[in-house]
Structures are given as structure tokens and as C-alpha cells.
Amino acid sequence: MAKEYSRTQRIGDQMQRELAQLIRREIKDPRVGLVTITAVDVSRDVGHAKIFMTVMGQDSAEEIAQTIKVLNSAAGFLRMQLAREMKLRSVPQLHFHYDESVVRGAHLSALIERAVAEDGQHQEGPASADAKPESTEE
């Protein structure tokens, strides 16, 4: 029977929970906004972890890049704090990356909504012109 949930996935999930709390509690830099950890991808040898995150309220590329720079510079501190919280022989090196899937998903959702609205307008136009007026005679 194959394992459905690998060790690296379990480590990644625990790291996601712990990092979310640590960043909120320990990182006091004003350049870091409301960070949401969306995923953690741990390498098979548990030597490296890619942390995918989004930042609420920061839409410009400069602000996002600044937040990632701050988090990557605090990666050693966060790794040390993770070592205290997690029971691992060695804690992976942390590499923060911006998760563009949320922005891409919102953009695709807006495109779909616009297409549905335009399709609805096209459907209403010819249908109302072809409709026969109802008679009120009884």
C-alpha cells in the first residue's frame, strides 16, 4: 500500500502553519504587510523549502519585491524559530517566492464573468426582437 501523504508533504504543511504564526508574531518590519503562506514545497532531501506567499494590500511589484527581500533576509531567524517549534533533525533552508496563482485566478475569474455578461447581452438582444407580442384578448 503506497503512502498517500508523504513525509515531505507533512513537513511542508506543518511549516506552513508555523511560518504563518512566526511571521505574524516575530517579524515587525513595516515593509512586510499581511503575509499569507499559500504553500510550502519541501525538497525530497528536506534540505530546501520553497515558501509561496501572497501579500494583502500590496499590489505593486516593488512592494511585493521588498516584502520578499525582507523575508528572505529574515530566513535564518525564521529557520531558527522553526527549529524550536518542529521536531526535525535538520530544518530546511527557506526560500520565499511570490505566489502569482491567486492574482492569475482573480484575473481569469474576471475574464470569465465579463464573457458571461457579454454572452448574456448577446442572448437578450436577438431573443427580445424575435419574441412575438402576447395578446391580451381573452
From Swiss-Prot:
<comment type="similarity">
    <text>Belongs to the RbfA family.</text>
</comment>
<feature type="region of interest" description="Disordered">
    <location>
        <begin position="117"/>
        <end position="138"/>
    </location>
</feature>
<dbReference type="Pfam" id="PF02033">
    <property type="entry name" value="RBFA"/>
</dbReference>
<comment type="function">
    <text>One of several proteins that assist in the late maturation steps of the functional core of the 30S ribosomal subunit. Associates with free 30S ribosomal subunits (but not with 30S subunits that are part of 70S ribosomes or polysomes). Required for efficient processing of 16S rRNA. May interact with the 5'-terminal helix region of 16S rRNA.</text>
</comment>
<dbReference type="GO" id="GO:0043024">
    <property type="term" value="F:ribosomal small subunit binding"/>
</dbReference>
<dbReference type="InterPro" id="IPR020053">
    <property type="entry name" value="Ribosome-bd_factorA_CS"/>
</dbReference>
<dbReference type="GO" id="GO:0030490">
    <property type="term" value="P:maturation of SSU-rRNA"/>
</dbReference>
<dbReference type="GO" id="GO:0005829">
    <property type="term" value="C:cytosol"/>
</dbReference>
<dbReference type="InterPro" id="IPR023799">
    <property type="entry name" value="RbfA_dom_sf"/>
</dbReference>
<dbReference type="InterPro" id="IPR000238">
    <property type="entry name" value="RbfA"/>
</dbReference>
<dbReference type="InterPro" id="IPR015946">
    <property type="entry name" value="KH_dom-like_a/b"/>
</dbReference>
<keyword id="KW-0963">Cytoplasm</keyword>
<comment type="subunit">
    <text>Monomer. Binds 30S ribosomal subunits, but not 50S ribosomal subunits or 70S ribosomes.</text>
</comment>
<keyword id="KW-0690">Ribosome biogenesis</keyword>
<protein>
    <recommendedName>
        <fullName>Ribosome-binding factor A</fullName>
    </recommendedName>
</protein>
